[in-house]
Amino acid sequence: MACNSSGCESGCYDREKDNGSKIVDDAVSGGGNHESVCVKCKCNAPMTFGDGGFDDGRFCADCFRNNVFGKFRLAVTSHAMITPSDNVLVAFSGGSSSRVSLQFVHELQIKALKNYEASRDRSLPVFGVGVAFVDETAAFPALSTEMIDAIEWVRYTVSCLSPPAKDLHVVPVESIFGSDSLDARDRLLKLLDSVPDDTGKEDLLLHLKMLSLQKVAAENGYNRLVLGSCTSRIASHVLTATVKGRGYSLSADIQHVDARWKVPIVLPLRDCVRLEITRLCLLDGLKTVELACRSQCGINDLVSSFVALLQEENPSRECTIVRTAAKLTPFYFNKIPETDDSNVPMATQRRLKRFNLKYDGSMTTEAFCPICNGPLNRSDSSELDTFEEGQESDVLYAACCSSCRFQILPQDGSSLEQFSSFLPDHMISQVKHQKVDSQAYLREKIKDCLLLDDEEVV
């Protein structure tokens, strides 16, 4: 990729005011060896970040940024993540990955707007962009002040982006429990308190956040949900899922596209490591905010620390973990659904058919865990057929994956009954639908052995 000396063209109003240029100048001046040149363009001085990365001091500012943006753009175009007719919701947590994801989506929108204005027929519309921030104050009351400051910072960051304007949705995590905020907050706290395991509590909150994002996306007409998950986070997820016994559903979580949800999820930063993203934030002066909402004593934090240690010893370790896991067979929903909509350009429809992943028909599943929404093997959900309608807690236990049974669900019957009463209505309805689907599947398999109403036993 050739060096682009014209700059980033991000369109951010306050880039200079936030001292982004000063950061770049300081980084370049700290390079030490001014006689060396960028290994890509062979003309500009390389950047030196001093973070100990294996490629530190090899690329100039423009080439480094173009390299990271090129990975993002390749993922978007190859998997048809964003098309002109789409309405995209970017999940923004304030961290470095989500900040870069928002910036890159913003730049794609600016380019689409310029192409639209320069076109004579203006046949390709400009895709819409919204931003969603999940407010976790109800789950972490001690961080209420920090959360308020973070929300104000998010509002300011989104407002500083140049036109087209982007709607910001601040979503309380308890909103999925109902419109009554007090009752919803009470149910959330009781639900989390009923989970005895720290890792299970953290995982449950993560699932509730995803439901909150899906809810706001569906209610506001978005058809894509962009997450900022990078290679580093996915590598950690591969190991944690393996430790938790989620091997069957692992391949569903690590693909570029996940359409098992009502609003498909896309991961355009899947091929970018955290070090690259952190450097880009420093280079472009992209400010971030981190909230200490994560448990420091669970499996997730332990595995993240382990992967970070591996990465220090071998800079390619995270990529190796993700590439190895990517060899698993994807599910049928790990692709953007093909469409015959006349509003979608033919080039986009051809791209969907060309780049969609090939999957094994045996990986087709209609059963999903009501807690984590992980795909279930038919043998895992066969216990649903043995319960009556009145045994709601037992049906819930049978409908969940083995990992959620072990880490999230209470083990004794009375606590499980209480736990199920606190769950959001969405999860309860999914359990009921799953039981009906399981019974229909069982009837389909044994239909040749059933007698019709007008038949007699011989």
UniProtKB/Swiss-Prot annotation:
Pfam family, one: CTU2
Signal peptide: none
GO MF annotation list: nucleotidyltransferase activity; sulfurtransferase activity; tRNA binding
Gene Ontology BP terms: lateral root formation; protein urmylation; tRNA thio-modification; tRNA wobble uridine modification
Database matches in SUPFAM superfamilies: Adenine nucleotide alpha hydrolases-like
A single cellular component GO annotation: cytoplasm
Main location, first listed in the record: cytoplasm
Location of this chain's protein in the cell: Cytoplasm
Keyword Ion transport: no
The entry's keywords: Cytoplasm, tRNA processing
Pathways per UniProt: tRNA modification; 5-methoxycarbonylmethyl-2-thiouridine-tRNA biosynthesis
This protein's record includes keyword Translocase: no
Transmembrane segments: none
Reported function: Plays a central role in 2-thiolation of mcm(5)S(2)U at tRNA wobble positions of tRNA(Lys), tRNA(Glu) and tRNA(Gln). May act by forming a heterodimer with NCS6/CTU1 that ligates sulfur from thiocarboxylated URM1 onto the uridine of tRNAs at wobble position.
Family note: Belongs to the CTU2/NCS2 family.
Protein name: Cytoplasmic tRNA 2-thiolation protein 2
Native source species: Arabidopsis thaliana
Gene behind this protein: CTU2
